């Protein structure tokens, strides 16, 4: 079982400061005054000040019993908050929320899952449970959103490493694959070297420079996430790499949040507010994801690209280390895309790559 808590990092960590910037930006963009927000895997609520500043009306914190939620509940009850709160102790990707949540008149306007989605894709059953719980939590018209490692970026970097390894030729063994990605800022290591790449449960360790230990994640297969979200009653809105999120929103947020990216000795942006290369590299490892629970009383939402159940037996996609790897890998469900929805999905894929967004230079050129 993977822990719901990442290792502690110093405040000046490049990764941590960039993620905090994006979390603050998402809250500023999506949370209206007096909104009801739900925070999945809230831990000891490190974002308490953000919720205070957002002037929310009600807070729902959910995490496993060992997360320290009970301590937060006691602390919040001992002081007067401007908003009400409730805390539920259970694992939302394993247990049914109906067994724990009795105050259902307080459905959420927004459900956040900040950096913990990879904990829920170890199996298809876990992801299904999470998404059905999210759908139960949300009001019609409400949003489910958060931040997760960008599988498109990570997988593309990994396959480029494998391609380069085999292009060396000569004494290289054909069935041996490098299992790590390295940069000056981080190292990504896959736990198992194998030719198969399952849709669920593909584990890897992400360790940033200066960290004592790495974080264990599972790659998120975005087509499966979109399909299962739709089954749970959630429509796809957007999946956007954080480099693009920063570029799209920096003009609006720079004045408000620039101080989060600059301090006396660890600037993450240049004088014009543009990300430095090391910041861009780290930020590009992550993506936002946004889904919406449709409201039948309002204009019908845009249809989520439909991936039919078909023969979804989730056979592992075979990895072939050659020039055509982009076309071969993670394509088992391509044949299940019906013609009437292919244009919508193609648009997403052309823009984002078949696993998610990723920086432009790492995107796949072949649309589904």
Task: Mark where each language-model region is.
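Class I SAM-dependent methyltransferase Rossmann-like catalytic core
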Residues: 1-32
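Conserved class I S-adenosyl-L-methionine
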Residues: 34-43, 60
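A short acidic, Gly/Pro-enriched loop at the edge of an enzyme's catalytic core
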Residues: 98-111
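A short SAM/SAH-binding and catalytic strip from SAM-dependent methyltransferases
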Residues: 108-126
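Conserved beta-strand signature within the Rossmann-like core of class I S-adenosyl-L-methionine
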Residues: 140-149
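C-terminal lobe and adjacent flexible extensions of AdoMet/dcAdoMet transferase-like proteins
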Residues: 187, 191-368
């Amino acid at each position: 079982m993977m822990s719901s808590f990442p290792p502690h990092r110093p405040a000046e960590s490049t990764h941590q400061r960039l993620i905090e910037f994006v979390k603050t930006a998402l809250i500023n963009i999506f949370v209206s005054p007096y909104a009801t927000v739900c925070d999945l895997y809230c831990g000891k609520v490190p974002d308490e000040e953000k919720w205070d500043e957002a002037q929310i009306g009600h807070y729902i914190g959910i995490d496993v019993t060992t997360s320290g939620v009970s301590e937060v509940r006691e602390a919040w009850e001992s002081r007067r908050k401007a908003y009400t709160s409730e805390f539920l102790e259970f694992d939302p990707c394993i247990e049914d929320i109906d067994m724990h949540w009795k105050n259902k008149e307080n459905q959420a306007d927004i459900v956040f899952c900040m950096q913990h989605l990879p904990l829920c894709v170890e199996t298809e059953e876990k992801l299904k449970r999470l998404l059905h719980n999210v759908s139960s939590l949300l009001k019609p018209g409400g949003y489910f959103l958060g931040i997760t490692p960008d599988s498109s970026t990570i997988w593309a970097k990994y396959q480029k490493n494998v391609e380069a390894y085999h292009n060396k030729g000569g004494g290289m063994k054909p069935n041996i694959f490098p299992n790590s990605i390295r940069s000056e800022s981080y190292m990504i290591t896959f736990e198992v070297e194998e030719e198969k790449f399952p849709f669920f449960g593909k584990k890897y360790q992400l360790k940033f420079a200066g960290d004592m230990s790495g974080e264990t994640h599972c790659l998120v297969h975005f087509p499966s996430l979109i399909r299962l979200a739709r089954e749970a009653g959630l429509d796809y809105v957007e999946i956007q790499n954080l480099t693009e999120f920063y570029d799209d929103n920096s003009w609006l947020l720079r004045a408000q949040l620039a101080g989060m990216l600059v301090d006396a000795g660890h600037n993450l942006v240049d004088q014009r507010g543009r990300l430095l290369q090391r910041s861009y590299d780290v930020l590009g490892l992550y993506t936002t994801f946004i889904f919406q629970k449709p409201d039948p009383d309002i204009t019908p939402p845009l249809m989520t690209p439909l991936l039919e159940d078909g023969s979804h037996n989730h056979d592992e996609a075979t990895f072939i280390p050659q020039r055509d790897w982009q076309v071969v890998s993670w394509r088992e469900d391509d044949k299940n895309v019906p013609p009437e929805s292919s244009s919508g999905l193609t648009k997403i894929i052309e823009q984002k790559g078949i696993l998610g967004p990723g920086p432009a230079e790492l995107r796949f050129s072949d649309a589904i």
